[in-house]
Amino acid sequence: MIIIKTKNREYTIDENKEINSISAADTICPYRAYRSYHRKIPIKIDDCKEARKIAGSMTHYVILRQLKEQGCETEKIVDPELKFRADAICDGDALLRLRQTSIGTGMRLISGN
């Protein structure tokens, strides 16, 4: 389990959760997200409703980029080599973002301020 804390809430993430349709608690695949981490993202997601419109791999790296730019924090490193799913959480209309750590290929979910 991964715990993400925001100003108003605390979210618990189940790594074994199946990937379903995009919702307020969106899911991303860390491995796929990592591969496209440095890609230029043509789409800016402003709210969860927009995220629902984007399908397939586009969803993964668009959400990753959004996560990366704002930043959010857990104690657990998300290793892209692991084949588990992590939830990308929406806090209101703002998607929390994923930031690459200084540890090699590792990534860390960090909670926005």
Swiss-Prot record:
In its UniProt entry, what is this protein called? Coat protein TP1
Give the location in the cell: Virion
Superkingdom assignment: Viruses
Q: What is its main location?
A: virion
Q: Which GO terms describe its cellular component?
A: viral capsid
**Sorted UniProt keywords:** Capsid protein, Virion
